Amino acid sequence: LKTKLVVLFFGALLSFSAIAQDKPQFLGDRHVARGVQCQVCHGPQISAQLKEDDQRHEPCVQCHGFYDQVAKKTTPENPEEMNPHSQHDGNLPCSTCHKGHKPSVNYCAECHYYNFKVP
């Protein structure tokens, strides 16, 4: 009986550690892990901005460049593949896909079948 309990305990422990590793990392987490301070994106008025639904490009372009620059960086090697930043909808706000402190979404998949991995 003790052996079964020990095996069950360690099995549960391994299962929980595997689940913890599968937790998605949000963009905010990635930025913090790279040493980017909250104020870089949110500015000095961070508490006021956190209450707003900020759909602007400005915080992103400071580090990542403007839309055409991002499109060049994300051009796939295979011309058969689609570039998520070269779109017919125009220059959508970055936050259309990249949610910062929430899970990102593949906006293109609303109408198309593109298997983009959106960080």
Question: Across the structure, where does each feature detected by a protein language model lie?
Answer:
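Positively charged n-region of N-terminal signal peptides that target proteins for export
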Residues: L1-L5
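Bacterial N-terminal signal peptides
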Residues: V7-S15
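Short sequence/structural segments immediately N-terminal
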Residues: A18-P119
